[in-house]
Every structure is written in C-alpha cells, then in structure tokens.
C-alpha cells in the first residue's frame, strides 16, 4: 500500500461492481437518466501495466461485456459533470469513504469534503435494491459464513498454552486462503 499500483486487497464498497459488473481500480461511472445512458470513465492499461500483468481485455471490451456502450477517458468526467451542473441537473452520489474520492468530488462538483453527505434518496434506493439477494449472492454469503466459522473453530482447536497470537492467526489465515477467500480486515488477536 506504499505504492500507487499496490491496491487494497479488498473492496470497501461493492456498489460499483453491483451496478456496473466491473472490478477494476480507477473507474468512475454515471447513470444519466435524462440522457438514458450509462457511461464508464476510465483509461486503458498503460504499457507498464501490460508488462506487469500480461495481455488483458481492453477496457472497451470489458465495458461491452457488461452492456455499457459509453466509455470515456477518466479526464472527461469533470467536464461532463460541470455541464450537468450548468444545465441544472441534479447529480446524486453516494457518500465517499476515501479521502482521494472526496477530493475528486470537490473537483467535479465543487462540494467541499465537509459537505459531501451524499444523496439521501439515492442512498435509500441503493439500500432497497441491495436488500434483495440473488441465489448466487446467497451462496457467496453462506460460503463466507462457513469459512468464518471454520476459521474460529480452527483457532480453538490449535490453541495451546505458550502459543503466540501470530501462530493462531496464521492458522486462521490458512483456512481463509485455502478456501480462496481473502480477509476484509486483519484478524484481531
């Protein structure tokens, strides 16, 4: 996390993935109801990224796969939003978590970070939609619960007098990783 390309190992919020079906860092999106279009703002991979990760589908191809026809470079979101504001359009957004996102919102909409509370009607609409779970989502939730239970049971089984906490945590992490799961936060030991 000491380098821009070392992204976090987890998503703090899956709203972007939920609505746009893409799990890629550095993307922004707008659902423009007035224009009846969805736009993803992002940039194609740099040559450095391609050398590091190998050949990848282009961002354009990824957008096509999820049914988004409009892709614009990241730099164009500012002018797009400024035009919306100039036309008097309401711009709804969810409350930002990360400080860099608060700075982006300030640049895009002119709203200081201390006043970025998000749109309550939009927040309520997202909550209402996210309350309904598909069969696939329920399977993943149940898997997460099962793995978490296995982690705790493993900790209880391996725990011995004189063990260090890091040894117990290592066993818990082994259970998670052997199930192809990553922790959303460090184990509290």
Regions found by a protein language model. Give the residues of each.
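A composition/biophysics-driven feature that prefers long, compositionally simple stretches
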Residues: 1-150
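Active-site cores enriched in adjacent His and Asp/Glu residues with nearby glycine-rich loops
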Residues: 1-2, 142-189
